[in-house]
Amino acid sequence: MSQPLTVDCPTCGAPVEWDAKNAFRPFCSDRCKLIDLGAWAAEEHKIAGSQESEDELYSGDLEPRH
């Protein structure tokens, strides 16, 4: 039998076994999962991209305000 895949928890760095039985993967616990969610909600994490490209992408979908 092969060794189980182990990854580091993105929040605290603890080793986490990557297994379907682990409901929190890639996190080690519900607490670390919620800390990460809070960081996204507080905009501490962002996906790289320019604001201009987003504006161009959606500007035709909206009717002008009067």
Curated annotation (Swiss-Prot):
PANTHER family tied to this protein: DNA GYRASE INHIBITOR YACG
Example of a GO MF term: DNA topoisomerase type II (double strand cut, ATP-hydrolyzing) inhibitor activity
Cofactor note: Binds 1 zinc ion.
Protein's name in the database: DNA gyrase inhibitor YacG
Keyword Metal-binding: yes
Species assigned in the record: Pseudomonas putida (strain W619)
NCBIfam families found in the cross-reference section: PRK00418.1
Function according to Swiss-Prot or TrEMBL: Inhibits all the catalytic activities of DNA gyrase by preventing its interaction with DNA. Acts by binding directly to the C-terminal domain of GyrB, which probably disrupts DNA binding by the gyrase.
Assembly description: Interacts with GyrB.
Intrachain disulfide bonds: none
Cofactors, names only: Zn(2+)
Biological process according to GO: regulation of DNA-templated transcription
Gene3D superfamilies named in the record: Erythroid Transcription Factor GATA-1, subunit A (3.30.50.10)
Binding-site list for Zn(2+): 9, 12, 28, 32
Pfam families to which the protein is assigned, alphabetical: YacG
Annotated family: Belongs to the DNA gyrase inhibitor YacG family.
Keywords attached to this entry: Metal-binding, Zinc
Region spans: Disordered: 45-66
